Design a protein with these regions (language model features):
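A structural boundary/capping signal
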Residues: 4, 11-12, 143-153, 222-231
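Acidic, proline/glycine-enriched N-terminal capping motif
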Residues: 4-62
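Acidic, low-complexity central loop/insert segments
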Residues: 15-26, 63-152
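Residue-level signal for inorganic ion chemistry
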Residues: 29, 76, 185
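Short, conserved charged micro-motifs
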Residues: 31-36, 83-87, 135-138, 212, ...
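A mid-sequence, solvent-exposed acidic-amphipathic segment
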Residues: 139-194, 199
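Glycine-rich, small/acidic residue-mixed loop/short-helix segments
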Residues: 166-176, 190-232
Length: 232
C-alpha cells in the first residue's frame, strides 16, 4: 500500500467520498504497536487495518475505531466527535513513553461502496473499501449503507460505557482477538466468549417498528445475512 505521506497526488486522481464524521489520530514514537497492543481488543501486531475497541475494565465499549499502519506510525480512524477524548484517554496510558498522540488534520478517511481504491473494510467486505488520504472531498451515503448492513459504530449508536464489546457483534465483525493476550477489559470479554454467552446483540429492525422497550426475542427483527451465515 502507498505510504500515506506519499499518497496525496495519487488519491486526488481518484473519485473519493470523504467521511467527514471521522478523524485520524497519529501515534508516533518508540514501539507504538506495543503500546496500542496492550490496550485494545484486537491484534495490531500483524496485518492492518483492523477494527478494535478501547474498553472499560468491565469490558464495556468506550471507543471503537480502525487501526492503520503508516510506516512505523499507527493511524486511528475514529469518530470525529470523540477524537479529542480518545487522544486524552490514550495519553493517560502513555506515562513516560516517548510517544506522540495527536489528531492529524491533514488526513481524512475515504470510502467507496463499490471498491477499486483502498482495502476492504475489515469488519465486513460488503461495507465497501476505505483508505486514509488528504482531507478534501465531501461525504455521501456511507452511514445509510453501513446501517443497512447492521454495523453500528460510535457513541451515538454504541453508547459510552453502556454496551459490552461482544454485544456490539465485535466477535462477528473481526473486532476482537482471543489469542493476543491482555488488554483493558479483556477478562470479561474472554469470559463471555468462553461461556458462549452473549445475552444481547445489535440487530436491524424494519422501518417504523422500533419500540423503546426491552424484548427477549424480537421475532420480526431482521438479522443481517452476515450474522445468519456466521451462526449457521
Amino acid at each position: 500500500m502507498l505510504s500515506f505521506r506519499l499518497a496525496a497526488s495519487y488519491l486526488r486522481r481518484m473519485p473519493t467520498t470523504t467521511l467527514q464524521d471521522r478523524s485520524v489520530i497519529r501515534l508516533s514514537g518508540e514501539d507504538v504497536r506495543g503500546f496500542v497492543q496492550g490496550l485494545v481488543t484486537n491484534d495490531v501486531g500483524g496485518a492492518l487495518p483492523v477494527w478494535a475497541g478501547l474498553l472499560t475494565p468491565q469490558g464495556k465499549a468506550l471507543f471503537d475505531f480502525l487501526v492503520w499502519a503508516d510506516g512505523d506510525d499507527l493511524l486511528i480512524d475514529c469518530e470525529a466527535t470523540q477524537a479529542e477524548a480518545l487522544v486524552r484517554r490514550l495519553s493517560l496510558y502513555r506515562l513516560r513513553r516517548p510517544i506522540k498522540i495527536a489528531i492529524d488534520p491533514a488526513l481524512a478517511v475515504h470510502w467507496s461502496k463499490d471498491g477499486g481504491e483502498g482495502v476492504p473494510d475489515p469488519r465486513l467486505p460488503a461495507l465497501g473499501h476505505r483508505w486514509i488520504g488528504p482531507a478534501d472531498e465531501p461525504a455521501e451515503g456511507w452511514r445509510e449503507h453501513r446501517l443497512s448492513l447492521g454495523v453500528a459504530e460510535g457513541v451515538d449508536e454504541l453508547g459510552s460505557d453502556k454496551t459490552l464489546w461482544l454485544e456490539a457483534n465485535a466477535d462477528l465483525l473481526g473486532g476482537v482477538s482471543f489469542t493476543k493476550g491482555c488488554y483493558v477489559g479483556q477478562e470479561n470479554t474472554a469470559r463471555m466468549n468462553w461461556r458462549n454467552k452473549v445475552n444481547r446483540r445489535l440487530f436491524v429492525l424494519p422501518d417504523g417498528r422500533v419500540e423503546r422497550r426491552s424484548v427477549d426475542n424480537p421475532g420480526d427483527a431482521l438479522i443481517p445475512q452476515w450474522m445468519v451465515a456466521e451462526q449457521a
